């Protein structure tokens, strides 16, 4: 009863070897028991790989192994694999030997990433570990009735939100195929609001348990003044929009009416490959 999406069609692949002293980066496993522990782990870690996902299931004993984080909600057993920054004592660049006196990565937070960029032609560590990241097409293999729900929970309300979120999952037992948690920090330059907190993405199958769960979920978001991603939520109506974005709803509705209904989506990838 637990499905999950498949990401990627690899058109080309290239093997890359990346070498850096083992004293700089280590991998550490850490177990957590609930969503609040997940949030605190994300919030307090200097560097976590960007995809932290797990599968929710109530009937199977299978383990879904992701890139970083795997486990089942019903068992309350999850495992993070995180990248840990250590202290640099010695670094070799070609024929030169540069000695550092216990330079702390914690104090110089971007040093490791800059060094990685130097050695890998300005590529991020995610692209080093998974070289096909930028050569993929995302598609889902979920059931026909399926939506993705995204929101941003304000920082001060995260703990209470996650407790209630777990409660309504246990209460309604929806088919959730993926939950994505990500620390959110925006200063307002790219958005018309300023928020710090937790960004959540949920893949939900629309079945007999969906309506009751969705109603409680949207009420929970309104209660905690969460920001909803209406681009992803195809079920949201204008009344819900007005409650979430009271300041911008009139402007949004006005511009929606200007959209040309005859416009059809087109993409060069589909023209070339399908």
Pin down the residues of each PLM region.
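A generic structural motif
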Residues: 55-56, 84, 176-183, 228-235
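A common structural junction motif
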Residues: 169-177, 219-228
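Short amphipathic alpha-helices in soluble, non-transmembrane regions
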Residues: 163-168, 213-221
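N-terminal flexible segment immediately upstream of the FAD-binding catalytic core
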Residues: 128-147, 179-198, 264-274
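Short glycine/threonine-rich loop-to-helix capping motif typified by GTGT followed
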Residues: 64-74, 121-126, 186-197, 239-249
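C-terminal substrate-binding/cap subdomain adjacent to the FAD-binding core in PCMH-type
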Residues: 1-167, 175
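C-terminal structural cap/anchor segments
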Residues: 151-204
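Activity-critical C-terminal alpha-helical subdomain
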Residues: 209, 226-274
């Amino acid at each position: 009863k637990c499905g999950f999406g498949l990401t990627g069609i690899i058109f080309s692949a290239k093997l890359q070897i990346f070498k850096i002293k083992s004293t700089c980066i280590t991998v550490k496993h850490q177990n957590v028991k609930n969503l609040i522990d997940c949030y605190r782990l994300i919030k307090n870690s200097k560097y976590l790989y960007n995809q932290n996902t797990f599968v929710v299931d109530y009937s199977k004993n299978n383990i879904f192994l992701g890139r970083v984080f795997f486990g089942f909600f019903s068992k309350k057993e999850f495992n993070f694999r995180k990248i840990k920054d250590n202290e640099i004592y010695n670094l070799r660049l070609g024929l030169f030997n540069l000695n550092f006196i216990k330079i702390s990565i914690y104090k110089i937070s971007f040093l490791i990433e800059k060094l990685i960029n130097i050695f890998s032609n300005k590529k991020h560590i995610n692209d080093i570990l998974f070289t096909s990241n930028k050569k993929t097409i995302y598609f889902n293999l979920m059931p026909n009735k399926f939506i993705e729900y995204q929101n941003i929970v304000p920082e001060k309300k995260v703990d209470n939100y996650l407790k209630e979120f777990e409660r309504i999952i246990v209460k309604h037992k929806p088919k959730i195929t993926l939950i994505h948690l990500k620390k959110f920090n925006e200063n307002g330059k790219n958005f018309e609001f300023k928020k710090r907190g937790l960004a959540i993405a949920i893949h939900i199958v629309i079945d007999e348990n969906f309506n009751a769960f969705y109603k409680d979920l949207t009420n929970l978001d309104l209660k905690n003044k969460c920001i909803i991603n209406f681009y992803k939520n195809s079920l949201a109506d204008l009344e819900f929009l007005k409650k979430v974005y009271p300041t911008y709803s009139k402007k949004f509705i006005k511009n929606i009416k200007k959209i040309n209904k005859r416009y059809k989506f087109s993409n060069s990838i589909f023209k070339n490959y399908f």
